[in-house]
């Protein structure tokens, strides 16, 4: 009794000390170049000059209203109104806004878009070219119309109902249902779960024009709006324009106050299950709710400190559970803890715990309580803290320093929007990144220990089983759960902390040589041939100021050719296992990524039908160790311990007992038709999973990764060439030459259908909502010169716009549709163009016919001058942005070199090639597509 009371006293003191430390106000610095003001009508504005990208700007209007402001007869109309903003305004009737902007390369759905949530509605036009003053004035007029002059014409409203219905259909997935069920649990007793943004079909289908106008007139008003403009302009001149343009907008008389929605009072414990008759699994979900910081606290350093602490605790607890589930005696097959904010209403931490085999649902309560009680009683070790901290830094990308000149318009805009809606800090993004890392670096283990009681003991705890009543699970009663919680509290627990392995990174191999160097035409890249037959494509990264100074892509060109033809499914599962666990010298990848020894040395292993790839990107001071790790992944691999292997096998086999989704079954059949039963698509069954052994892993590793003569290594670095050459000879050229296996003759994994084909399957709809998922495909060949590839890009742009106009806007048949092409590097010149969409079954055949007719009509008449101009404007802008990104990132520059080598096409002359593309080129490409092989795939869910 005395000890227990002492612990409570210590916890109380710790929480008080944490609160006291946080109470010392340390405000975040305000970006002095942001001009923030308020017009007489109450409209807020944010303006800032930024020349990245040069000659462009982002334009936003933010409405501090959303679905919460809807009356019962307006359920879904806040979102519907967002759609209507693109269907006619006072100065831009019908599709005038889209047509006006797309003519200047500002593309709908990409640069022109909007979103609606329960609390806000935000419209934006980004990457807008600042070509002339009159054009800028016209763009501001679009924002002006979105503020108070959306037309909502009856015909446009009726035409849009079909589009909204199809968007509603996309939000009936199992994931959407889980999210809504969780919202209902978190916000029980409040109005929050009563609005889901998309609304009800009854309102969508039947509302009157007056009802949406009533919402519009009441809530779209300047004292609830903000204009945000960031880009390459004179900020003072832009402020004058905004004052002149927006000061005339009036607030309605007798403005209705915006209601402040209150949460139900917190209680200590609640028990409320989540029932879904289409659920395919059982899980215990435990929610820990805490209050969210008030507005005045959100621009303080303490705000970020608390968020980081919460993330670190979650990462540490998840890591512990990952270790525990490896034991065959553990009742759980998987446990994870995440900590998030639910808007600005509350913090919550969520445990999701899945049972192992036939473990009782009640045993999952033991698993949660033991972990929570152990954390409260014993805390974390220093190693656990450092490991979790490292993981959070990586997840939040805090280790990537952001240079001031690299800050983009959208990064500045995001801070302004957050400031207006939530009171967030108006700190310049590069400074914000720096301060966040300073806060993270300053955190000590004691900070975590002090916060644990607040996060657990002082939370409202909600115990909730997610289950399908049809499955016959014996779900515990509230009384049974309470009794088990009490029993767990009396347990004499031991401190079960994670123990981290120490890895030896030393290399004892004879150094090899670079035996030949040659420049690569049309680039700064050099090709180095090594003494073991390996090829290294080295590219200098002059001018890159990022902290990441080295990118290495280690590519072994084996893939499906290295499979044992009699054992493909088992070898594919072995590859999946290695993608997650391949490590070095007795420590697997999961352990490595959690180890402070591997701080700043991430690596990724992946396998495809054409190659095996290991990638890493590090700072200059980590380069030596990164190369060492790469060498050891090839020469001294470690796959995992027996316990991890058995746990993975058992969990995978268990998951295979669950009913397969219709989309999974459909994709399997589609791939057989599209890829002509390519071995890469061999299905992994339970027998293949159970065939996993250390010997099989070693054999697959040797087949896929240890062929130096089939290896291309792409290195891009801002480090001196001499250093990279030294690392290359020590760590790459030293890898053993020779290959003990014979590669099979396997065709490249590319579509290979001929003539006209259909693949149609019908399944029972899991969501009780019927839909058809359609893909219309054409397969054809083009020349591989840059001009021909540009023609494919232009065709994609124009046909996407036509499909959007016909299939989405005129038919109201889908929420999203596009015409997109894939160019297969494995078989040069092969192109597959696809039109993809979801729709209601009764419109399926009509829309499929539309897709075919749109391409046929294009082949008859070709593109218009306006379409050619819009496509070239957009593609030119996109290419310039792509080139800019390559200039500031060694990773992106390296990826582009790898792509160029694989394709044989260097896009440095893309601008020239694009300018030379003619309407005749596009017409020829379209006709090739229309004459090519066809494959129609339809997944019906009814």
Task: Locate predicted features.
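Bacterial N-terminal signal peptides
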Residues: 10-20
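Bacterial N-terminal signal peptides that target proteins for export
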Residues: 1-11
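Peptidyl-prolyl cis-trans isomerase
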Residues: 100, 149-152, 156-157, 404, ...
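M16 family metallopeptidases and their MPP-like homologs
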Residues: 48, 53-70, 77-78, 95-145, ...
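Extended, domain-scale alpha-helical bundle/helix-rich regions
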Residues: 445-463
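His/Glu-rich zincin catalytic helix
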Residues: 25-99, 124, 138-141, 213-329, ...
């Amino acid at each position: 009794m005395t000890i227990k009371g002492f612990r409570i006293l210590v916890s109380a003191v710790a929480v008080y000390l944490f609160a006291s430390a946080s109470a010392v106000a340390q405000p975040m610095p305000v970006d002095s170049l942001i001009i923030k003001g308020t017009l007489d009508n109450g409209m807020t504005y944010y303006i800032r000059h930024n020349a990245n990208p040069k000659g462009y700007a982002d334009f936003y209007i933010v409405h501090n209203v959303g679905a919460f402001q809807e009356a019962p007869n307006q359920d879904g109309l806040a979102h519907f109104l967002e759609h209507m903003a693109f269907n006619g305004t006072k100065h831009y009737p019908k599709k005038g806004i889209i047509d006006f902007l797309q003519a200047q390369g500002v593309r709908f759905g990409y640069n022109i878009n909007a979103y609606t949530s329960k609390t806000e509605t935000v419209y934006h036009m980004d990457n807008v070219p600042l070509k002339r003053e009159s054009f800028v004035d016209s763009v501001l007029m679009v924002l002006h119309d979105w503020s108070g002059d959306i037309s909502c014409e009856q015909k446009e409203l009726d035409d849009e109902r079909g589009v909204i219905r199809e968007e509603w259909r996309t939000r009936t997935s199992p994931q959407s249902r889980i999210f809504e069920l969780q919202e209902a649990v978190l916000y029980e007793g409040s109005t929050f779960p009563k609005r889901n943004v998309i609304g009800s079909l009854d309102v969508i289908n039947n509302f009157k024009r007056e009802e949406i106008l009533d919402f519009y007139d009441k809530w779209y008003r300047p004292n609830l709006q903000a204009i945000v403009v960031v880009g390459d302009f004179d900020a003072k001149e832009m402020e004058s324009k905004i004052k002149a343009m927006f000061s005339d907008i009036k607030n309605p008389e007798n403005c209705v106050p915006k209601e402040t929605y209150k949460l139900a009072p917190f209680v200590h414990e609640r028990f409320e299950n989540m029932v879904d008759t289409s659920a395919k699994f059982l899980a215990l979900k435990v929610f820990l709710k805490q209050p969210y910081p008030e507005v005045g606290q959100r621009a303080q350093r303490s705000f970020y400190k608390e968020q980081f602490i919460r993330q670190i605790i979650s990462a540490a607890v998840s890591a512990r559970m990952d270790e525990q589930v490896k034991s065959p005696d553990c009742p759980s097959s998987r446990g994870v803890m995440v900590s998030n904010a639910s808007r600005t209403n509350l913090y919550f931490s969520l445990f999701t715990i899945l049972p192992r085999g036939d473990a009782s649902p009640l045993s999952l309560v033991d698993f949660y309580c033991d972990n929570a009680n152990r954390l409260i009683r014993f805390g974390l070790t220093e190693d656990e803290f450092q490991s979790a901290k490292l993981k959070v830094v990586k997840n939040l990308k805090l280790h990537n320093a952001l240079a001031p000149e690299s800050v983009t318009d959208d990064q500045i805009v995001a801070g302004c929007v957050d400031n207006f809606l939530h009171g967030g800090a108006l700190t310049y993004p590069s400074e914000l990144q720096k301060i966040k890392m300073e806060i993270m670096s300053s955190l000590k283990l004691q900070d975590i220990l002090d916060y644990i009681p607040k996060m657990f003991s002082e939370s409202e705890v909600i115990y909730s089983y997610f289950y399908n009543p049809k499955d016959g699970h014996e779900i515990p009663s509230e009384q049974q759960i309470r009794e088990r919680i009490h029993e767990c509290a009396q347990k004499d627990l031991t401190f079960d902390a994670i123990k981290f392995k120490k890895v030896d990174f030393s290399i004892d191999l004879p150094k090899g040589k670079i035996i030949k160097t040659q420049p690569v035409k049309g680039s700064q890249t050099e090709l180095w041939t090594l003494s073991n037959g390996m090829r290294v494509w080295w590219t200098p990264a002059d001018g890159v100021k990022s902290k990441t100074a080295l990118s290495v892509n280690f590519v072994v060109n084996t893939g499906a050719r290295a499979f044992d033809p009699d054992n493909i499914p088992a070898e594919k599962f072995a590859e999946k296992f290695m993608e997650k666990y391949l490590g070095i010298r007795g420590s697997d990848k999961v352990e490595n990524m959690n180890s402070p020894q591997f701080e700043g040395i991430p690596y990724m292993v992946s396998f495809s039908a054409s190659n095996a790839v290991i990638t890493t990107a590090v700072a200059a001071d980590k380069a030596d160790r990164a190369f060492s790790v790469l060498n050891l992944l090839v020469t001294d691999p470690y796959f995992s311990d027996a316990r991890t292997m058995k746990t993975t096998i058992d969990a995978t086999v268990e998951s295979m007992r669950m009913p397969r989704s219709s989309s999974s079954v459909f994709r399997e059949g589609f791939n057989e038709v599209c890829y002509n039963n390519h071995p890469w698509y061999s299905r992994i069954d339970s027998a293949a999973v159970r065939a996993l052994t250390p010997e099989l892993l070693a054999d697959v590793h040797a087949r896929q990764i240890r062929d130096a003569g089939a290896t291309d290594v792409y290195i891009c670095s801002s480090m001196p060439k001499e250093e990279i050459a030294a690392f290359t000879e020590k760590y790459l050229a030293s890898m053993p030459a020779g290959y003990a296996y014979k590669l099979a003759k396997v065709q490249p994994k590319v579509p290979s259908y001929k003539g006209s084909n259909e693949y149609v399957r019908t399944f029972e709809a899991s969501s009780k909502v019927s839909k058809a998922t359609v893909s219309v495909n054409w397969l054809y060949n083009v020349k591989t010169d840059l001009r021909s590839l540009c023609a494919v890009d232009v065709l994609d742009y124009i046909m996407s716009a036509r499909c959007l106009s016909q299939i989405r806007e005129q038919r109201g048949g889908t929420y999203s549709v596009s015409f997109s092409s894939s160019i297969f590097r494995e078989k040069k010149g092969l192109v597959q163009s696809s039109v993809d969409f979801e729709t209601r079954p009764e419109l399926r055949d009509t829309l499929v016919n539309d897709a075919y007719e749109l391409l046929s009509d294009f082949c008859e008449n070709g593109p218009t001058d306006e379409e050619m101009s819009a496509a070239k404007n957009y593609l030119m802008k996109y290419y310039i942005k792509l080139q800019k990104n390559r200039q500031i990132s060694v990773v992106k520059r390296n990826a582009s070199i790898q792509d160029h080598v694989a394709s044989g096409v260097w896009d440095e002359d893309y601008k020239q090639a694009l300018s030379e593309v003619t309407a005749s080129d596009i017409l020829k490409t379209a006709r090739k597509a229309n004459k090519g092989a066809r494959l129609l795939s339809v997944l019906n869910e009814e």
